[in-house]
Amino acid sequence: MYTSNIQVASRYAKSLLKQAIDMGVLDHVYKDALFFKKVGKSHKTLFRVLHNPIIKNETKLAILTSIFQSRIHPLTFHLLKLLSHRKREGILPTIIDTFLEQYYIYRGIKAASVTTTFRLSDDLIRYFKNLAKSLVPCKEVILKEYVNPSIQGGFVLRIEDQQLDNSLATRLHKLKKQYSIAEY
């Protein structure tokens, strides 16, 4: 029977989350996951090495050990060793992403994004987080901000399957459409 990498990653992530909760180190493991994503983003060759079947598992483990062992919690490092032993280092990025999703669900955290024509001040970030909380019940909101001059002003807030489009570009488009329909 074929099991996809996503299903396997989900099992590892779920086990990591449960073990971290049981050991009382969930926040440490969460920080480790964020650190791993940061390293992976700045060193894209790391992912290519992990996915490369030609590179020996011992070499992959040595690389992971040199980068992470002194910087992450022993539970997280144990996962890296386990994956190397089982020759599954290539799914580590998927495990990390899945772990973060499960962590956010466990903590009641929702991800939202806001698009404006400028960088947001701290006050505006708080405002948009509160606005997102009013749209979807949650304990906390992680807000990603995007700058896009094409919206011409206003904002577009997205959380889960909801979008609050209060951009000038959309309002102008609606007005244009309304006046093109209304013939004199």
UniProtKB/Swiss-Prot annotation:
GO annotations of cellular component type: plasma membrane; proton-transporting ATP synthase complex
Keyword Transport (UniProt): yes
MF-aspect GO terms: proton-transporting ATP synthase activity, rotational mechanism
Swiss-Prot/TrEMBL keywords: ATP synthesis, Cell membrane, CF(1), Hydrogen ion transport, Ion transport, Membrane, Transport
Bilayer topology term: Peripheral membrane protein
Subcellular location, principal: membrane
Compartment(s) of residence: Cell membrane
Summary of the function given for this chain in its UniProt record: F(1)F(0) ATP synthase produces ATP from ADP in the presence of a proton or sodium gradient. F-type ATPases consist of two structural domains, F(1) containing the extramembraneous catalytic core and F(0) containing the membrane proton channel, linked together by a central stalk and a peripheral stalk. During catalysis, ATP synthesis in the catalytic domain of F(1) is coupled via a rotary mechanism of the central stalk subunits to proton translocation. This protein is part of the stalk that links CF(0) to CF(1). It either transmits conformational changes from CF(0) to CF(1) or is implicated in proton conduction.
Subunit structure: F-type ATPases have 2 components, F(1) - the catalytic core - and F(0) - the membrane proton channel. F(1) has five subunits: alpha(3), beta(3), gamma(1), delta(1), epsilon(1). F(0) has three main subunits: a(1), b(2) and c(10-14). The alpha and beta chains form an alternating ring which encloses part of the gamma chain. F(1) is attached to F(0) by a central stalk formed by the gamma and epsilon chains, while a peripheral stalk is formed by the delta and b chains.
HAMAP family: ATP_synth_delta_bact (MF_01416)
Protein name: ATP synthase subunit delta
Organism of this sequence: Amoebophilus asiaticus (strain 5a2)
Gene this protein is translated from: atpH
